[in-house]
């Protein structure tokens, strides 16, 4: 550079090779020089060295000439470079001189500072001491004001600032001011306010975590209570005041102010307790305070509900109030759980504890157990067991009232129970669904199954309640079935009292199954016991009403009852006969269905009962003619009414039981379907490995079988009465009596009316129709059937038979409100005897063939021949005419 700072032109114009090119050029020149030196030193010949020397000299001269030419060509640039070099050299010299001067000045300063160092050090020490004294005095003043400052911050609920003040004061007392005498009073005062601060923080947390969630739900009740009742209770009055002031709404963590209070409180506790042990101790203490507050709030909740429902000593609550209480407690615990869940997140972050929610639900379970125990009347049972267990240990002294006795030494025995209704084990029905949801919520929150509350309820249900229900059911069913009024027919009701009582028991058990669905299998087993006992009892009742004939071959047959078995009972007990009769159309028509017509024609009724009449006449016709006696009949109308009531009661009972089973919830049905049971019946038969619904259905079907037997027995019995009264009409008798009909017809009509009067108010219309429909067809068939046993009939006897048929028809029509046209056929049968001789009967057979069967026409012809004075004594007269009749009938076919 020159003096003006400009860059030399020649230097700027010169071409500078690239670094790679310069490296290659230098490498080539160096290699050439080394080769020359090597050749000069290694050449042995002098001539060769001379040649090399001359070549080098030539090259040197050429290089010198080239340099001179270049210098000459760039003379101006060279001069500028030299000038620039001289300028730079002069500047460097000046800088070196100035640096030398600075070095000399620094040496001078150093020497001067070393001279004043001792004086400055002395002054610095004096200043530091003065500053330290001032700071100590300021800290002492701050420490003296710390108690009042802490108290002021506590009153403003600025817990974090108060905790910081406590920490700073402790650090001063235990640190810089530890050697200062006379601070013990201040230290004690600060510790006292520290305890107050901790208590205040814990109270605030308990209030936000427990009190406010509980009171939020109580405020809704308080708003509905009249003012004069609110003023009677201090707690209700305080809640009402909160409600009016608007401060009764529960704080939520979503609320910024509430969250800041919680965060401030937790951070304050974290500041106050430095060690993990101290923090855990305070969290445990906080949870214990929360547990005590839960117990207190439950008592307050019961008080508020009592006042709201106007419950006092003169007006007891019921299970509805208990259900409302448990629902309210469940809602309160849910609200408190939400608060604890969000509080637990802060505690885990600040204090390192993860069991806040778990601890809360443990306390909640304990509190719920107390409430449940007091309302289920569990404690008296436990106290009774304790009394029995400690009866042998008699106390010599009592210390409850001594001065050294603890305040809560006997609190458990004198604590007022927080109950809203009369304690009873059956209260579990209304509260178990709520408890079940609480148990599920608890297990979900504490991640433990089963929870303590579930174990408590399981112990109560399995060890106490099920056994109590079983014992009470046993005693109640004993009273329902063994009492004198159990099987006595009521005058204004068709259902037996025992049936209604047992059904009520079954409804109670079904209510238990639905309410306590987790133990549905246990209560369903009790249900089966009730049904089995009832089936055994009804079987005994039916057996007593239908005794069997004693077996003469038995040695103790004389000691057996002498009451004979009735024909209807024997036929009903016969499986083949009963199965046959129940397979007939009239039996199926007895059950009302949408396909059953409301009103049937006489033709339909006759067609339904035609086959039955044939069966009865075929089995009972000859016996009735020869050996049927009044002892074969049921003549006591109370028994008749009892059979009807038993049928209707058991049918009604079976339908109700099926409806109870059908109304069970789906989850209960699914549980019972997987529960297998074994049932022992009265006859020793076992219902083994059946599901509960199947076993119940089996018991119901067995009861229905008894009911069907009762109805079938009534159906057969009234027909046996017809056989009994109409069979004697076939015997010879004096026709000189002036009575229109024979006494047997009158007796039959009387029996039919008695049957109808006793059955019409008990049996349903369809069942009543089953009993009486077809009697006209049967009586008509009996008149015609017994005509084969009638002796010679005079004209008066013929008329008498016609009047008997008409008398039966008249009496039966009054009952059925139908003409009973089948008896018109019987009357027409005997009318043919009045108007025709045997040959005349043969003449009209083609006309009457459709009205009577071939057998009946044979009966008619035989009776006509027997009644004819001339033909009755002629040998072969009947056979000849029977051949003619058969010929006519064959031609008709």
UniProtKB/Swiss-Prot annotation:
Keyword Transcription regulation set for record: no
UniProt keyword list: Exocytosis, Protein transport, Transport
Tissue specificity statement from the Swiss-Prot or TrEMBL entry: Pseudocoelom.
Record's keyword annotation contains Protein transport: yes
UniProt superkingdom: Eukaryota
Coiled coil: none
A GO BP entry: exocytosis
Region ranges (Disordered): 1-27
Quaternary structure note: The exocyst complex is composed of sec-3/exoc1, sec-5/exoc2, sec-6/exoc3, sec-8/exoc4, sec-10/exoc5, sec-15/exoc6, exo-70/exoc7 and exo-84/exoc8.
Family (UniProt): Belongs to the SEC8 family.
PANTHER family in UniProt: EXOCYST COMPLEX COMPONENT 4 (PTHR14146:SF0)
The protein's name in its UniProt record: Exocyst complex component 4
UniProt organism field: Caenorhabditis elegans
Taxonomic classification: Eukaryota, Metazoa, Ecdysozoa, Nematoda, Chromadorea
